[in-house]
Amino acid sequence: MTIAFSNFYKDNILDGLKKIITSEFNKMPIYNDYPFINRGGTMFLNIQIVDDIDEEIFTSGALRQISVSIRLYQKLEGVQDFNKNKSIQNRYAERMRSLIEENSNYKVSNTPQWINGSVVDIDYEPDLNEDENNYMACELSCEFMTMQTFTIQA
């Protein structure tokens, strides 16, 4: 007997976040790069799983709390009006917060992908590493509860 695992990070969390965000921001590229890769776009998102905690373990799976970082990058090119660009970026971040909170219990085909999804913090001035210096960024810290099921194959 073997236990089969699925990529529940992608299936339950990342795919849902991408679908929700692209429903509103359909032209914004979304990546899952670690470490950061300079993509050259004017504005893009980078979504990373930053923590995973087993909340409760069952014989058929585990209830897990997944922490996710969503960084919104805006490239700084030429003479920029910092306040105008920061205002645009902040509006995008607040709209993403609303989208996640409107979908706090997210289902696909009546199957729960996550429950109690929320944005716990927005950092409008996150620390940037050297590769990110040509960008203005803000970071949404999110948490989701999801069920990872174990499938036993004979």
Description of each model-found segment:
Residues G41-D52:
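A short, hydrophobic beta-strand-centered structural micro-motif
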Residues M1-F36, D51-A154:
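Charged, amphipathic alpha-helical segments and their flanking helix caps
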